[in-house]
Amino acid sequence: MRLDDISKFMEQAGIPGRDEYALTPSRKRFPDGASYRIEMSGVEGPKVLEALIDERRKRNVPVHRLVSMCQGGTLFDKQELRDFAQMATEDKMEVVMVPGPRNAWDIGRQLMTSEGARCGASHHRGSDELRKVIADIMRMYDVGIRGFLIVDTGLLWLLKKMQNQGNFPKDVALKLSVWTGVSSPAGAKLAEELGATSFNPIADLTLPQLAAIRKVVDIPIDFYIWTFESYGGPNRLYDAPEVARLYSPCYFKFEPAPSAGGFYSPFTSDESHITLMRKKVKWAEFVIDLIRENQPDMKVSEQGPADLCIPRV
């Protein structure tokens, strides 16, 4: 079969037959009319959030979403979670918390091998693990958190099913993690149809690949500006103006560190997280200034837009 014929059949299924080499600008926007927002990952507890808030106010940098407790919400007590929720509410930021830790904290070891990790390493193993992660989500919801990072498409499907049956809250953000490996328009369409409120594709896609993904989905896309050295460490600061133009609405996501496993650990000091968080806010300021200079029509949301799932305390 000719490649052009396959492209035609893909188009009939609602998927671009080629990557978007024309780099057509996106006309989609956030509800407030903005093209992009700022997401900070690795906000590991109240002390780190306090430093983030202090730094963003000094620099007058809006921060809209916090991917938080990446080492696992289980490791924080309810008072820490309440304090975190209170601070985020007062500064009008959405909190997306990471349930767990899960994988490698049970008996499964396949994911710890270089080849075994290719086989759905982020997915929850068995019904018991699904039950535990949902319980962890509800523990955080009960103290006011309304956003959660989902690392398993099966769990996302289950949560949406439970929502429809009235057994899981609907006033939440369900962000699909980069660990699910979304890397094509078909994968992006599946994420949207399963009920993700936003999703994080892999970090090293080209601009034409990204633009093709944007054509098929309306939900916000979470774009890695900078990520772990262990992920290859792609730094895409200077891609930001074009990404805002092509990929709107999008979150620019800042998560540089040596590795996820090493940095998101209860053995890493608050001081290390605080130092890096202040730098992340500085780099967000650079990105906003770069977009203003090169794509002045691409607007960033003000602090605290109304559609965020800000904690309820």
Task: For each feature predicted by the language model, list its residue ranges.
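Hydrophobic, aromatic-enriched interface-forming segments
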Residues: 194-197
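Short, glycine/polar-rich helix-capping loops at beta-to-alpha or helix-loop-helix junctions
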Residues: 183-187
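Active-site pocket-lining/capping segments in soluble small-molecule metabolic enzymes
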Residues: 1-145, 150-182, 200, 207-313
